[in-house]
From Swiss-Prot:
Belongs to the ribose 5-phosphate isomerase family. Substrate binds at T26, G27, S28, T29, D82, G83, A84, D85, K95, G96, G97, G98, K122. It is an enzyme of class 5 (isomerase). Pathway: Carbohydrate degradation; pentose phosphate pathway; D-ribose 5-phosphate from D-ribulose 5-phosphate (non-oxidative stage): step 1/1. One of its GO terms (molecular function) is ribose-5-phosphate isomerase activity. This is Ribose-5-phosphate isomerase A. The active site is at E104. InterPro entries: NagB/RpiA_transferase-like, Ribose-5P_isomerase, Ribose5P_isomerase_typA_subgr, Ribose5P_isomerase_type_A. Its EC number is 5.3.1.6. It catalyses: aldehydo-D-ribose 5-phosphate = D-ribulose 5-phosphate. Homodimer. One of its GO terms (biological process) is pentose-phosphate shunt, non-oxidative branch. Keywords: Isomerase.
Amino acid sequence: MDELKKLAGVTAAKYVKNGMIVGLGTGSTAYFFVEEIGRRVKEEGLQVVGVTTSNRTTEQARGLGIPLKSADDIDVIDVTVDGADEVDPDFNGIKGGGGALLMEKIVATPTKEYIWVVDESKLVETLGAFKLPVEVVRYGSERLFRVFKSKGYCPSFRETEGDRFITDMGNYIIDLDLKKIEDPKQLANELDHTVGVVEHGLFNSMVNKVIVAGKNGLDILEK
């Protein structure tokens, strides 16, 4: 599957042209996209400016010699390529399994052409089997946890090596084990209006193309 993920990443890189501002995604498939952009910068003289979606991707891009700018310094991104944890037939998705959902959404929002690269296991009829990440400020997070629990959202604080996971922005993540999300837009609206929630992993109707790596090769889905 790694070879197919690599092929998906390389294919996505073909949408990147000279002079573009490019959003550089995070995750196992987006990794290959960033690697290919780095190769083209070095070997073909590709001239682009990258905007990264995580500290991990920043380190990768710098190591490859890709020029970078902060999201603060740009108004429009030409193309962003990123991964996703689930994608439904309406191009709604869940992201944030790697913990970078806030930066990913900040980069996705001003993007003209937003592309996801995924393997075929990420295509689902209904979102929710993958736990929905919700990034929350630390202050009041225990109360917020109880609110989610009272709603039957089966929350859990994300942990790493026995300690609470802390995002690149210094926040906690509460994962919601919802099993099935019948109305992603309604849930997104609810979370958007919940005090203490910084961002959530529902990316509804944001993506333009999904490049799918499957056992039979690549499939490019478009709206």
